[in-house]
Amino acid sequence: MNFHQQFKFLNSISTHASKAIIDLHILIMRCDNRVSLSEQHHTQDIIDLLPWTDGNSKQAYYQMSVAKVRDVLANHEVEDLLQQISDVLNNQITREQLEFLTTMIVSADHVFTDAEAEVVEMLMAMQ
């Protein structure tokens, strides 16, 4: 099964859910202040697959989300952001799909940090 087929379930989500997935990606990648090149490439691959009907580009949203996540991490509001993401994704993708997605994010560079594990665990507890 190729990469595109693995993420076929993303075709049916809303733009709102696409934004939540971008936020989640950035949060997981930056929660330990370490963003590897393979994580960046992997994130770009998934972002390219996300449905998008917003007037602004995905790239513009991505940049805005990076700034938002930086604030969230600085103010220790990770749980609040995860709750928002969970609420949005709850009706859009199944828990199994979310688990698959988060696993793919954190294993992109084969370095699974405690900080990443904590974020994923908190999100799964909300679903």
Model-predicted segments: where are they?
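Small-residue-enriched hydrophobic alpha-helices in membranes
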Residues: 1-127
